[in-house]
UniProtKB/Swiss-Prot annotation:
One of its GO terms (cellular component) is viral portal complex. It is found in: Virion. GO terms for molecular function: DNA binding; structural molecule activity. Pfam families: Phage_portal_2 (PF05136). This is Portal protein B. Belongs to the siphoviridae portal protein family. Proteolytically cleaved by the viral protease during capsid maturation. Homododecamer. Interacts with the terminase complex composed of two small and one large terminase subunits. InterPro entries: Phage_lambda_portal. It comes from the Viruses. Forms the portal vertex of the capsid. This portal plays critical roles in head assembly, genome packaging, neck/tail attachment, and genome ejection. The portal protein multimerizes as a single ring-shaped homododecamer arranged around a central channel. Binds to the terminase subunits to form the packaging machine.
Length: 530
């Protein structure tokens, strides 16, 4: 019987079969035959090694400069030196009049600024942090521990106007009592209901070494009124995830290897720099060990002493020197080897750059930012790299920093309204009926890094003139609040007029000249080839 011809690939497999998904196969040449990872949920993969993984990340951040720089980049680009509020209650949904809502917004922002950035850290129950420092710490902890815990507390002993305080809680203190295994409804210190929603958290009271307390406290997720009793911020990647995964998991092995590699390379360079030259002998292994482990006999019969005396006598007689350049003669069988450090790199720089690029990709930052090396990058490449990193930082600001900030602000606003410290305008819903509408806010952090300040300003002004942007968005990119800038400009303009100073016209003329030059055709500004 004649068979129907079938097209096959290089392995003899029918072509139609080879065109299907091959991720579950052995791979070309069998490379994936032993790659058999189990299909696990996020909690099943993360929680058994959570404490060890976080401890390793802590160690890297404390003792590795690259890891410490990665955390600092998250703090500086996501938060910056001041985390400013732009309060935006949903006044239409709440049924407020726009003019009344604007006055209410101004009063809330002024009161929040005084409370949040107090000079003695009044917002912190420990008295150590301002609000911005809370957010910076939270972003840093989220980078190397994967989550943030902040506990709102009520201070009944304070003499300050507001009694709401916050307590930073280390993720290392949140665990199943006694560091036990837990169960379906108690996972790594988090109690969950049948839907996976957190119900309560178990916190070790004191994790200080040898403190001897070992007591665990159960803190509910929220109080009966709906006020949060524990703020838990992390970005889940899968259904049913209970705890956050730190960002160093994917690059932890490379970071540790790079650390060891750099230390070994440094030791090698130090050894080569310590010795200008060495004299190598052609003693065989047996004789060398015999001399080194000379038998405990009389001085004259000790082989180690005898050979050293011969070497000493020879070199004393023949005056072998290196500083004087001339080396007349060596002991028979010896060899002079000069130690040079010129070849100490041996491809190390290229390997280091490759590892740093891998680590930077895993941490969401650019290679130039992580290594602080801008020597091999052009303007276009630097701006493209900075824009990619900026997009990542903006996502982290929105879903991590701003989320924590808004929840902290909501706890404070609840007290301010409930105790009548701030009188809100008439609304159809009270705070407890529409908590999100009352607490809605945008947050202004660090501005975008300007590669070329002039071009950045030109782009911003052109967008505003073309109706593609606003002063609010443009100044937010610079890390500024447009309302503060406008108020300051009004004050400065009035002071200049009062002092008899005219407006500096040269600023506008210089700017218009720069705009005109930037709009010239490229061939007019570039010298032609002859």
């Amino acid at each position: 019987m004649k068979r129907t011809p079938v097209l096959i690939d290089v392995n003899g497999v029918p072509l139609r079969e080879s065109l299907s998904y091959n991720g579950g196969g052995a791979g070309f040449g069998g490379q994936m035959a032993e790659w058999l990872p189990p299909a696990q949920s996020a909690d099943a993969a993360l929680l058994p090694a959570l404490r060890l993984g976080n401890a390793r990340a802590d160690d890297l951040v404390r003792n590795n400069g690259i890891a410490a720089n990665a955390v600092a980049l998250h703090k500086d680009h996501i938060v910056g030196h001041m985390f400013l509020i732009s309060y935006r209650p949903n006044w239409r949904w709440l049924g407020m009049r726009e003019t009344a809502a604007k006055s209410f917004v101004d009063e809330v922002e002024a009161a929040w600024s005084e409370y949040a950035e107090g000079m003695f850290g009044e917002i912190d129950v420990e008295g150590k942090r301002t609000f911005t420092e809370f957010i910076r710490e939270g972003v840093g902890v989220h980078a190397f521990n994967g989550e943030i815990f902040v506990q709102p507390v009520w201070d009944t002993e304070t003499t300050q106007l507001f009694r709401t305080r916050f307590k930073a809680v280390s993720p290392k203190r949140v665990d199943t009592p006694g560091h036990g295994m837990g169960n379906r409804f108690l996972r790594a210190g988090v109690e969950v209901d049948r839907y996976g929603r957190a119900v309560a958290y178990h916190i070790c009271e004191d994790d200080f070494p040898f403190s001897g307390s070992g007591r665990w406290e159960r803190i509910p997720r929220e109080l009966p009124t709906g006020r949060p009793a524990m703020l838990h911020i992390f970005e889940p990647v899968e259904d049913g995830q209970t705890r956050g995964a730190n960002q160093f998991y994917s690059v932890m092995e490379r970071l540790k290897m790079l650390d060891s590699l750099q230390a070994t390379q440094l030791q090698s360079a130090i050894v080569k720099a310590m010795y200008a030259a060495t004299i190598e002998s052609e003693l065989d292994t047996e004789k060398a060990f015999e001399y080194i482990a000379g038998a405990p006999q009389e001085q004259k019969d000790n082989p180690l002493i005898n050979i050293l005396e011969k070497f000493s006598s020879w070199y004393d007689t023949n005056n072998v020197t290196l500083g004087g350049v001339k080396i007349p003669h060596l002991f028979p069988g010896d060899d002079l080897k000069l130690q040079t450090a010129q070849d100490s790199d041996n491809g190390f720089s290229a390997l280091e750059q490759a590892l740093l690029r891998y680590i930077a990709a895993g941490l969401g930052v650019s290679y130039e930012q992580l290594s602080r090396d801008y020597s091999k990058v052009s303007y276009s490449s630097a701006r493209a790299s900075a824009n990619e990193s900026w997009r990542y930082f903006m996502g982290r600001r929105k879903f991590i920093a701003a989320r924590l900030a808004t929840q902290m602000f909501s706890c404070w606003l609840e007290e301010a309204l409930l105790r009548g410290i701030i009188r809100p305008p008439r609304a159809r819903f009270d705070f407890y009926q529409a908590r999100s509408a009352w607490s809605r806010a945008e947050w202004i952090g660090a501005g975008r890094m300007a590669i070329d300040g002039l071009k950045e300003v030109q782009e911003s002004v052109m967008r505003i003139e073309a109706g593609l942007s606003t002063y609010e968005k443009g100044l937010a990119l610079m890390g500024e609040d447009y309302q503060d800038i406008f108020r300051q400009q009004v004050r400065e303009s009035a002071e200049r007029q009062k002092a008899g100073l005219s407006r500096p016209v040269w600023i506008e003329q210089a700017y218009q000249q720069q705009i005109a030059e930037s709009r010239r055709p490229e061939e007019e500004t570039t010298p032609r080839e002859t």
